[in-house]
Amino acid sequence: MFQPNFASVEWRVVSLALLLSLPNTAQADPLDKEISNLLQQRFSIAVLLSDTDAIAFGIGDFDPNALFDTANPEFGTDESINERRSKSVYVLPYTTNFDIEGSEDLHELSFKAFTIQTENDLKLFGTSKDLLKERTYGASIGYGYLYKASENVTLSTRTTTHLMRYENSFSTDNKLSSIIGRILDGRAVNVSAWAAIVQPSIKAKYTSPTSWGKWHASSTLNSFIGHSCGSANNGNIGNPKGWYLSNEITGYYNIYHGEQALFTGIKRVDLSHDLSDELGSPHYYEASIGWLFYAPKPFDWLDNFGIGVNFNYGSTLRGGSIQLYYNKQ
């Protein structure tokens, strides 16, 4: 028997179908708003998930409770690990700095390409196989200015523009689910949409060299706003907007005469409404530990590379993952 969970993706799909089946005058406004919010959130969450400084996805996911012999659901659950594994997030970022003649300040250019793919096994009716595949593709370019406020403090501002495409497809082996799919077809499922998003950010960073290496603390506020278009929901897609605040501290311990370093860090990320709806919490924490190699350098553009482990705590994506790093700052 179908047991409705009013906070679940499954129930949102069913409720959309029920609204669509009502007479036009009864369903138009609430349905348009619900689908519009759903599509808007897909672009909003893509801004966060493609920011490797805010959230980490790796080459393998695991439950930290199994590693530490604990039973804390905030570290991870079967559901949250499956949620992580249902998402394939690939981000290729590159950042380069340019000196300003006669100044310690720097110009910064950043480029990024990314793709986010999610497979939602909805099971709308008991054992039915109802698969919603979602894909978001994007490219970004940003300009930043880094101001050397003192020997230890750097203040920076950056503006990034994103161009994104979202699409989804729905398939099922169940007759009732197929009815829902036909009702929502072209409105909420089997649709595509585009968004152009502008993302300004400001950052303050304190760096302290030590006898054993260095440590730094930083605070970064990101906001974003955009415009969406496309055929989904008759063009009523909603415009993504939101913000997130990241505070972190990281330490680096030099080994092998500074050619390698061990690092550990922790961060807290606070989220705006749309993002917190997607991640199930107004904030989450991430902790990381790893090993970086500064030499040998196979490419001039590669400052360092390494491997580590990251832990997400407190969100629907809580759990552990194995990380590969390059040009980590």
How does the language model describe each region?
Residues 88-90, 107, 139, 287, ...:
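One face of beta-strands
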Residues 56-88, 117-134:
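Surface-exposed strand-loop-strand hairpins of Gram-negative outer-membrane beta-barrel proteins
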Residues 36, 81-88, 92-101, 296-298, ...:
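Subset of outer-membrane beta-barrel
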Residues 1-74, 101-105:
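Cleavable N-terminal export/targeting peptides
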Residues 229-329:
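Outer membrane beta-barrel transmembrane domains
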Residues 49, 56-67, 101-112, 154-158, ...:
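Residue-level detector of the transmembrane beta-barrel scaffold of outer-membrane proteins
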Residues 33-40, 94-246, 266-272, 279-282:
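Outer-membrane pore/translocation modules
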Residues 70-93, 278-294:
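Generic detector of solvent-exposed, compositionally biased contiguous segments
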